[in-house]
């Protein structure tokens, strides 16, 4: 049996302000730093240690991972970063308030943009300075692969090849793996691992900073999964994520 730990980054400054973030590089809030610290403590209390870590190219996930590894006394382990683990690109919604957007377009429309499988928001124009083609961290990636907007289906299409080529291979080699990423890149992976339907993924909410453990068989099929931490806090955190796209 293998174990895999997934962690969504702690609350970011834009999570706190209820803004669509996507590929915008936003720091952790004070609460997010505390969440990452608590995630590290819970992992340490439960005896977890790791051989390799994977993260995105975005600072909120990187900082969450660094805080967790410091808590574990494991800042020395290898960390591999990839744009393929970035948050889903929210296109022209990036920077907009979720509740205000729900007031304008309706809660149902915002829910579809946030949680549906195959409906992307309006795209960014390539001339927009927020477009990833203008970000130096992605200069080695073909422009055709950098998104102007994404639905979850698009996110799955970039996450799963990285899972297969890099992460799954590390697990099979016997390495203990932690992934620090984002709500939608982790939803993409969970959908694949659990073979979830397009409808069921709509209801999945992953809370910030709380370690999610997958126990996998020899073929990397899930045996079971569970969050580490206080059950009431976990439930409240999941409800908070679910309510982000509702009107004020």
UniProtKB/Swiss-Prot annotation:
It is an enzyme of class 5 (isomerase). Its EC number is 5.4.2.11. GO terms for biological process: gluconeogenesis; glycolytic process. PROSITE patterns: PG_MUTASE. Signal peptide: none annotated. Substrate binds at residues 8-15, 21-22, 60, 87-90, 98, 114-115, 183-184. InterPro entries: His_Pase_superF_clade-1, His_PPase_superfam, PG/BPGM_mutase_AS, Phosphogly_mut1. Keywords: Gluconeogenesis, Glycolysis, Isomerase. The keyword Phosphoprotein does not apply. The record marks 182 as: Transition state stabilizer. It catalyses: (2R)-2-phosphoglycerate = (2R)-3-phosphoglycerate. GO terms for molecular function: phosphoglycerate mutase activity. Pfam families: His_Phos_1 (PF00300). It comes from the Bacteria. The keyword Cytoplasm does not apply. The active site is at 9 (tele-phosphohistidine intermediate), 87 (proton donor/acceptor). Pathway: Carbohydrate degradation; glycolysis; pyruvate from D-glyceraldehyde 3-phosphate: step 3/5. Catalyzes the interconversion of 2-phosphoglycerate and 3-phosphoglycerate. Belongs to the phosphoglycerate mutase family. BPG-dependent PGAM subfamily. PANTHER family: PHOSPHOGLYCERATE MUTASE. This is 2,3-bisphosphoglycerate-dependent phosphoglycerate mutase.
């Amino acid at each position: 049996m293998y174990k895999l730990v997934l962690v969504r980054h702690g609350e970011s400054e834009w999570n706190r302000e209820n803004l669509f973030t996507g590929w915008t590089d936003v720091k952790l809030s004070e609460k997010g730093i505390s969440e990452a610290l608590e995630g590290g403590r819970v992992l340490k209390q439960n005896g977890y240690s790791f051989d390799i870590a994977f993260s995105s190219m975005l600072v909120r996930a990187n900082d969450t991972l660094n805080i967790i590894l410091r808590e574990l006394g494991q800042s020395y382990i290898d960390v591999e970063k990839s744009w393929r683990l970035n948050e889903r690109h929210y296109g022209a919604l990036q920077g907009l308030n979720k509740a205000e957007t729900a007031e304008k377009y309706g809660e149902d429309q915002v829910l579809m943009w946030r949680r549906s499988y195959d409906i992307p928001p309006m795209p960014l124009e390539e001339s927009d300075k927020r477009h990833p083609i203008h970000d130096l961290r992605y200069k080695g990636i073909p422009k055709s692969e950098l998104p102007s907007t994404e639905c979850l289906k698009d996110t799955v299409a970039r996450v799963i090849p990285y899972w297969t080529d890099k992460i799954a291979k590390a697990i099979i080699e016997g390495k203990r793996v932690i992934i620090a990423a984002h709500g939608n890149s982790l939803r993409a992976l969970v959908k694949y691992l659990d073979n979830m339907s397009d409808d069921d993924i709509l209801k999945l909410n992953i809370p910030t900073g709380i370690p999610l453990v997958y126990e996998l068989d020899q073929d990397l099929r899930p045996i079971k999964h569970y969050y580490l931490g206080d059950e009431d806090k976990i439930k409240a955190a999941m409800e908070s994520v679910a309510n982000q796209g509702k009107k004020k």
